[in-house]
Every structure is written in C-alpha cells, then in structure tokens.
C-alpha cells in the first residue's frame, strides 16, 4: 500500500514538472517579436556560418566527455560481474554442503532413527516435515495435549480417510504407520501393542495417557517423562529424544480428502487429549459426529480428566480467533499513510488548477489573435 502511494506521488511530481516546462506562457515584448520577425526575413550569411562553427565545437566536446565517463563505468561493471560470479560459486558450495550437514544433525539428534517405520506412499518420498497454519509453523499433538513431534527425521503423520480419529504416536513422538481404519477394539489394541513395542521405556502407552490426563491439574510428574505437565505455567516439555516444542497457530484436519490435513483459518486453537488407545473424544473437533459415534473403542476410565478445549486452562485459547474472526484481517491506518493520502490529494488539486489556468490562457491568446486578424 505504502509503495503504491509513493509511486503515485512520484508520477504526480514528474507530471507537474513536465507541464510547468512545456506550458509556461512566453510573454515576449512586442519589440522583441518584431526583431525576431526581421531576423527571419533578413538572414545574415556570415552570422549563420559562425553559428555552425560554434555548434560543431560544442558537438565535439561532449563526445570527449562521454568517453571519459564511460571508462570508469565499464570498470565498475567488470568488478560487479566478478563479484556475482564469486557469489554464485559460494552458493553452489553451500547447497552441496547443506544436505550433508542436515544428515549429520539428524543422526546426532535422533540416534534411534533407523528403527522408525517409513510413511505410506501418499506422502512425499523425501520425508519432509509438513506444516500447518498461515505462517508455516509445524503443529504438535501430545499424549495429554502436550506438543509432540513427528518422526526422527521429519516424517509427516497422516490421518485415516474414513473419518476415524488418528492415534498411534508413542511417547517419543515417533509416527506409527497402522492408524485406525475401522473403529473397533482389535485395531485399537494393535495400535497399543505397536506403541509398546516401539517405546524405549517399555511402558504401557494407554496407561501413561490416562495418568498424564489425571496429572494435568495436580502438577505431578508423569511416569513416562518424569517432567511436570507442559501446560502448567506454559512451561514446554523437554525430552532427551525430541526437540523442544513450541505453540502452533490455529488449524484443523480435513478427514474427507484422503485424510490430508487442511487449514481452516477461523477455527480456534485446540489440542488433543487422547483417552483409551489414543483416540480423540471431542464433538467440536469432528463436526457432525456425536462423541458416542466417534469414540467406540475402549472407554475412558472414570478417573481420567475431560478434554481441555476452549477454556482458560488452555494456553493456546484466544477468544478473538473464533468470536471475532474479522480482527485478524483488520488493517490499521498509520499516520504515514494519512500523510501520503494528503500529499497525493493536494498534488491532484494543484494539477487540476494548473491545467485550468493553461487552458484559460490559451483561449485568451486565441481570442486576441482572431481579433487582430479581423482588424
């Protein structure tokens, strides 16, 4: 917006200068006009020859000046070309070195990366981390609503295409490939077994989830991580096997289009608290489903905490996101913008006045000439 206004201002200034130079009325004295007419009718040959000689000298001098000016410009261009070539070579070297450095970092950060099951073919083969949200921040879900990470080397997780809740993340944040396809007890038990097999601590993931849910309000360290809950006092969970998590922008998952996540900007921030096999019990998350339809696996125990959604205990909760979605699009009018608008409007008015004056002046001259010709 500011750039456009600035460009418009520059155009107005140039137009004003051009109009001033081209349309300034030449108020010549009548005696000078007569002299000019006499000079036109009586040409002087000697004077004309002298003028030609002066013009020839003037034409010869700028050629020398142009040659002198062109030499340093050519040198500067050569230097710039050399610098560009050097920069391109450095960029090529950096691009070659980057993948090697990334591999080394991943191996140091995730020692157990070889044991992780690869993702299904509907994801990218390069195992690039996927991102949700307007500013491309990775989102994370954890066993009790805490942020978790997907895969040791950035493998994206996926959701089953038949609108089933996703599950199968173990305590280290590794993605399991056999997500729930049909909601029944056998599939949920299989997911739990896979979680237990891939868990380095050999803990029961289902029990850890329920214990973590119970400890949300008691601030007791969970048995899986021995850390206090990450959502108390907004302290993020730090685990030796996973990088430090951070909050994510509001997002939602579309479970119709092949289970791929799709962004809906007006959905408020949320997180998941899986219960009994890592399923999500939330009528607000899956619109059009009743909790009894969505959650048909092993029922949660009576001691487990209810999902924390849309309330003050959730640090990602913000009323503005879903009560006032128009606030996100609102643009503030800065004093600089007001100044630009004022300047532009004054320039437009000045241009109109100048054009009007010039037209009036031309009409007056035309009227005078016609009167003189009639007389």
Curated annotation (Swiss-Prot):
Disordered: annotated segments: 30-74, 113-253
Biased amino acid composition, Basic residues: 43-53, 120-151
Cellular location(s): Membrane
Keyword Transmembrane helix: yes
Signal peptide extent: 1-20
Segments on the Cytoplasmic side according to the record's topology features: 357-375
GO process terms (BP): negative regulation of DNA-templated transcription
Source species of the chain: Dictyostelium discoideum
Keyword Signal attributed: yes
Any single Gene Ontology cellular-component annotation: SWI/SNF complex
Name of the protein this chain belongs to: Uncharacterized transmembrane protein DDB_G0281039
């Amino acid at each position: 917006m500011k750039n456009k206004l600035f460009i418009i201002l520059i155009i107005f200034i140039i137009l004003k200068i051009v109009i001033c130079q081209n349309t300034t009325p030449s108020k010549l004295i009548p005696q000078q006009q007569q002299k000019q007419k006499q000079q036109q009718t009586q040409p002087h040959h000697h004077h004309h020859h002298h003028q030609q000689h002066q013009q020839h000298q003037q034409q010869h001098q700028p050629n020398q000046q142009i040659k002198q000016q062109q030499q340093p410009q050519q040198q500067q261009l050569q230097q710039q070309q050399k610098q560009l070539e050097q920069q391109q070579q450095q960029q090529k070297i950096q691009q070659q070195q980057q993948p090697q450095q990334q591999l080394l970092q991943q191996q140091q950060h995730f020692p157990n990366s070889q044991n992780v099951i690869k993702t299904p073919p509907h994801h990218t083969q390069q195992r690039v981390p996927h991102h949700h949200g307007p500013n491309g921040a990775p989102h994370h879900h954890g066993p009790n609503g805490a942020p978790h990470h997907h895969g040791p080397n950035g493998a994206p997780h996926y959701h089953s295409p038949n609108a089933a809740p996703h599950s199968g993340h173990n305590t280290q944040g590794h993605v399991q490939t056999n997500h729930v396809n049909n909601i029944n007890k056998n599939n949920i038990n299989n997911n739990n077994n896979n979680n237990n097999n891939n868990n380095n601590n050999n803990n029961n993931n289902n029990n850890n989830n329920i214990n973590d849910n119970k400890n949300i309000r008691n601030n007791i360290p969970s048995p899986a991580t021995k850390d206090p809950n990450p959502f108390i006092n907004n302290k993020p969970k730090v685990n030796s096997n996973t990088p430090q998590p951070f909050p994510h922008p509001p997002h939602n998952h579309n479970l119709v289009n092949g289970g791929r996540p799709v962004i809906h900007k007006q959905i408020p921030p949320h997180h998941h608290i899986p219960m009994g096999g890592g399923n999500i019990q939330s009528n607000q998350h899956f619109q059009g489903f009743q909790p009894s339809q969505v959650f048909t696996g092993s029922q949660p125990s009576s001691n487990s905490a209810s999902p924390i959604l849309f309330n003050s205990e959730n640090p990602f909760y913000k009323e503005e996101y879903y009560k006032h979605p128009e606030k996100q699009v609102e643009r503030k009018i800065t004093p600089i913008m007001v100044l630009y608008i004022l300047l532009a409007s004054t320039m437009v008015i000045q241009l109109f006045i100048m054009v009007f004056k010039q037209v009036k002046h031309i009409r007056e001259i035309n009227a005078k000439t016609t009167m003189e010709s009639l007389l």
